[in-house]
């Protein structure tokens, strides 16, 4: 009996452990609305951040129906340390340290969409690039420093550290090519990323990603180039 219990616990442990193989040419698929399906990403750097860039692809048909979380980075002091969120009828919401700015767009995302969001504390300049095109730069949380030891979640919006999810904020669709740097990429570098290049991500590296899956999330070949 004890041996059977040990085997069961071992299988459960392996089913929930970090994937060490990376996600090259793959994507996470969230097939239905939920408040318990998500992916937790393990950061390579665990330190306060004075700047960052996050780039990723996402694909969903929710954009005309409701809002949804694209990227959620929480610390114990601030659950919206970084939040990328699509707000229906408004556009892209970009939050740092709990403060929010809106990037209005004329085209609603219906195809696989590439996003890059960058921010730096020294100037407070926040940038959002959509499919290789820059939005107008805006000011956000100048002088702020992001806390360390983050909980990084795909598929849900964290309303507390690592939890408090809501179905109506969940992503239904695909997300992939999530990379993060601890500095603001230049326009030339972002264009290179959009064209398929890379610049050795040092916070999150999709090719060497470690993560934990919870709930109904599947790993499938990516649907974008």
UniProtKB/Swiss-Prot annotation:
Ca(2+) 2 binds at residues 159, 169. Residues 1-20 form the signal peptide. GO terms for molecular function: complement component C1q complex binding; low-density lipoprotein particle binding; metal ion binding. Found in plasma. Ca(2+) 1 binds at residues 80, 158-159. GO terms for biological process: acute-phase response; innate immune response; regulation of interleukin-8 production. Its cofactor is Ca(2+). One of its GO terms (cellular component) is extracellular space. Pfam families: Pentaxin. Keywords: Acute phase, Calcium, Disulfide bond, Metal-binding, Secreted, Signal. It is found in: Secreted. Its main location: secreted. InterPro entries: ConA-like_dom_sf, Pentaxin_CS, Pentraxin-related, Pentraxin_domain. Residues 24-225 form the Pentraxin (PTX) domain. Induction: The concentration of CRP in plasma increases greatly during acute phase response to tissue injury, infection or other inflammatory stimuli. Homopentamer. Pentraxin (or pentaxin) have a discoid arrangement of 5 non-covalently bound subunits. Interacts with FCN1; may regulate monocyte activation by FCN1. Belongs to the pentraxin family. Asp-61, Arg-76, Arg-77, and Glu-81 may be involved in the calcium-dependent binding of phosphorylcholine, a property that may be important for the biological function of this protein. Displays several functions associated with host defense: it promotes agglutination, bacterial capsular swelling, phagocytosis and complement fixation through its calcium-dependent binding to phosphorylcholine. Can interact with DNA and histones and may scavenge nuclear material released from damaged circulating cells. This is C-reactive protein.
């Amino acid at each position: 009996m004890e041996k059977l219990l040990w085997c069961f616990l071992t299988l459960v442990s392996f089913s929930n452990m970090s994937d060490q193989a990376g996600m090259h040419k793959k994507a996470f698929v969230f097939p239905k609305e939920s408040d318990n399906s998500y992916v937790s990403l393990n950061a390579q750097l665990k330190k306060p951040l004075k700047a960052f860039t996050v780039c990723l692809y996402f694909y969903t048909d929710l954009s005309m129906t409701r809002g949804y979380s694209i990227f959620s980075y929480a610390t114990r002091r601030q659950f919206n340390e970084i939040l990328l969120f699509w707000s229906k009828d408004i556009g892209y919401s970009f939050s740092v340290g709990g403060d929010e700015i809106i990037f209005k767009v004329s085209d609603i995302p219906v195809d696989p969409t590439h996003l890059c969001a960058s921010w730096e504390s020294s100037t407070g300049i926040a940038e959002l690039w959509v499919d290789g095109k820059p939005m107008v730069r805006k000011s956000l949380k100048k002088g702020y420093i992001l806390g360390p030891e983050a909980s990084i979640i795909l598929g849900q919006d964290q309303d507390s550290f690592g939890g408090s999810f809501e179905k109506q904020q969940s992503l239904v669709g695909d997300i992939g090519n999530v990379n993060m740097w601890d500095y603001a990429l230049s326009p030339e570098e972002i264009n290179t990323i959009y064209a398929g290049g890379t610049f050795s991500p040092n916070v999150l590296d999709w090719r060497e990603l470690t993560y934990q899956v919870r709930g109904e999330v599947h790993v499938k070949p990516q649907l974008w180039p």
